[in-house]
From Swiss-Prot:
Keywords: Cytoplasm, DNA-binding. InterPro entries: YbaB-like_sf, YbaB/EbfC. Belongs to the YbaB/EbfC family. It comes from Xanthomonas oryzae pv. oryzae (strain KACC10331 / KXO85). Homodimer. Binds to DNA and alters its conformation. May be involved in regulation of gene expression, nucleoid organization and DNA protection. This is Nucleoid-associated protein XOO1065. It is found in: Cytoplasm, Nucleoid. Residues 80-89 have a biased composition (Basic and acidic residues). Its main location: cytoplasm. HAMAP family: DNA_YbaB_EbfC. One of its GO terms (cellular component) is cytosol. GO terms for molecular function: DNA binding.
Length: 106
């Protein structure tokens, strides 16, 4: 029984280190979302902070379309970050047996 507890503690420590590393990598990540065939680009960090917005001047005359494309580009970047986060967090916990129903990050 002691061996099992010690093994669980080692697994937990390794998982914590892996998660910390994955979170640090995500914080450095920059992802660009696009909309309108590249007419609007929004770049977000892994923490979903907006770094850059590029808008093709040709769409500025149609305010509603510009607003929709900006929102779509932001959502595209946000979805890419979510997918990358899920992938990296999954890799950080690969091979570790988690109790049923337990999801990460905690």
């Amino acid at each position: 029984m002691r061996g099992n507890i010690a093994q669980l503690m080692q697994q937990a420590q390794k998982m914590q280190e892996n998660l910390q590393r994955a979170q640090e990598e995500l914080a450095k990540l920059e992802v660009t979302g696009t909309a309108g065939g590249g007419m609007v680009n929004v770049t977000l960090t892994g923490a979903k902070e907006c770094r850059k917005v590029r808008i093709d001047p040709s769409i500025l005359s149609d305010q509603e379309m510009a607003e929709d494309l900006i929102a779509a580009a932001f959502n595209d970047a946000s979805n890419k970050i979510d997918a990358e986060s899920k992938d990296r967090m999954g890799s950080a916990t690969a091979g570790m047996q988690l109790p049923p129903g337990m999801k990460l990050p905690f």
